[in-house]
Amino acid sequence: MSRPVPNPGILDIAPYTPGKSPVAEPGRKVFKLSANETPFGPSPHAIAAYKSAADHLEDYPEGTSRVLREAIGRAYGLDPDRIICGAGSDEILNLLAHTYLGPDDEAISTTHGFLVYPIATLANGARNVVAEEKDLTCNVDAILAKVSPKTKIVWLANPNNPTGTYIPFDEVKRLRAGLPGHVVLVLDAAYADYVSRNDYEIGIELVATTDNTVMTHTFSKIHGLAALRIGWMFGPANIVDAVNRIRGPFNVSVPAQLAAVAAIQDSAHVEKSRTHTEQWRNRLTEELTKIGLTVTPSVCNFVLMHFPTTKGKTAAEADAFLTKRGLVLRALGNYNLPHALRMTIGTDEANELVIEGLREFMAQP
């Protein structure tokens, strides 16, 4: 008997595995530090705006997220007509793949890049080409060496998840200059709000001056609206026009749009999160290094720690040890980092408990 056959590439996809949900010993307080969520939650203004939509849930959203696009435009100094909003930046990444990739095409991602990139690539029948990183950081020369006539997209998370590393804007510009004009460079800036380095740029300048570069961003991280799934893209008019032709007309709900508008206007809430993150990023790096772990320098709201391969000291054993204590970190075997754990920077209490827990774990005979 015949049965439906998925399109080429679909069955080659390894399903995405999100961060673990909290499970601990009975009676223990649980801290989820596996999904890079903010410990401060959304702005109170965003919560109030979200609730204000409750009396009109029978109404469809405005189809282009116009008010939200205008708010983003004001915040970043951008033309709203060159912005697309989506149900998380994941939707926009998939729309870009659907717009520009097909069978026999190729897209390039890096060794430890965001797992949605190969998923979006394979889902459209294209081939995912992996460029090696250097010191857990994107290597522009390695990416350029992988370019072929079949290359249609280069995916670049800057800064990158799960490594927390970034490349300076001069390197991003060098990458764009080295790519053929028909290749779309996708700059995923999900964690840009946490970066304070002088040589970093979110990508707006490059998008504004080329017709083959886009920048995506999200409200899930520093704005604390992950549950509402809101992302956006800034791109050249030609790409925005093409993507809008396949974007669903009501893809961002009214409550989500209202909450996002309020969130982007609350700069004090964002600054509080940014300050907390930077202080704890430095402290965690220092304390975990003292314990005997190797910590990859991070510019994000998480740290990547590397464990020995010695029995009793491994990442898997540390993960189990912490989980029993209600501290849920992210194992990274599916990112080709089996000897590492990623820790979201959480509340003061959660961060202190992780330090104490890992100190106890590493001190075991």
Swiss-Prot record:
Superkingdom assignment: Bacteria
Coiled-coil portions: none
Gene Ontology biological process terms from the UniProt entry: L-histidine biosynthetic process
Pathway: Amino-acid biosynthesis; L-histidine biosynthesis; L-histidine from 5-phospho-alpha-D-ribose 1-diphosphate: step 7/9
Cofactor(s) the record lists: pyridoxal 5'-phosphate
Matching PANTHER family: HISTIDINOL-PHOSPHATE AMINOTRANSFERASE (PTHR43643:SF3), HISTIDINOL-PHOSPHATE AMINOTRANSFERASE 2 (PTHR43643)
Stated family: Belongs to the class-II pyridoxal-phosphate-dependent aminotransferase family. Histidinol-phosphate aminotransferase subfamily.
Protein name: Histidinol-phosphate aminotransferase
Species annotation: Rhodopseudomonas palustris (strain BisB5)
High-level lineage: Bacteria, Pseudomonadati, Pseudomonadota, Alphaproteobacteria, Hyphomicrobiales
